[in-house]
Amino acid sequence: FLRARTGHGHDCSLMSFKTGDGLEATIECRSSSQISFLDQAGRVYTLAVSALPGGRGDGSPLSAFVDLPKGAQPAGWISADPNAAAVIVTSGGKGMVLKASDVSTRLKAGRDFVTLGEGESLLPPIELPLKAAQGEQLIACLSSSNRLLVFPLKEVRVTASGGKGMSFMTLETGESLVSVALVDDRGAI
């Protein structure tokens, strides 16, 4: 279920939910903005924040806004801020950097954006300022066999069209990428 609250800096632990529901994600953005999300099949969908129900009720189901294929689940959310970028990575070790504003679509059924290989899934996207994606920002990739690779994010080209992306980490047979994180100024992941 989706809902919008006015203002920033809300304490999410104080929000109430229906029995069996809980908080999945929060995005701070303007009420005039759009937000996008990717599903596990690599399709992207866009919602107008102004169309979301207010934060006092239980919200509305995601299916009221978009036509998700049966069984599809959101893999992650991105605000459509023109000054934001997002890192999109698959469990197969491929990924891309994109401008958050480039993933928007008007189609209620969404559009294909990320091409996934057999048995691959999307890792949650990482949103960051566009300047950081083109600067000295480091990114760390962790594989299922506990191999860690850290490299400058500026080595990854910014794309607007999606697709497979480039190789973030070469994986052995049966190995998958399990986590991707930005390295902060202190070198912590």
Functional labels for PLM-detected ranges:
Residues 1-189:
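Short, structured "edge-of-domain" segments at secondary-structure transitions
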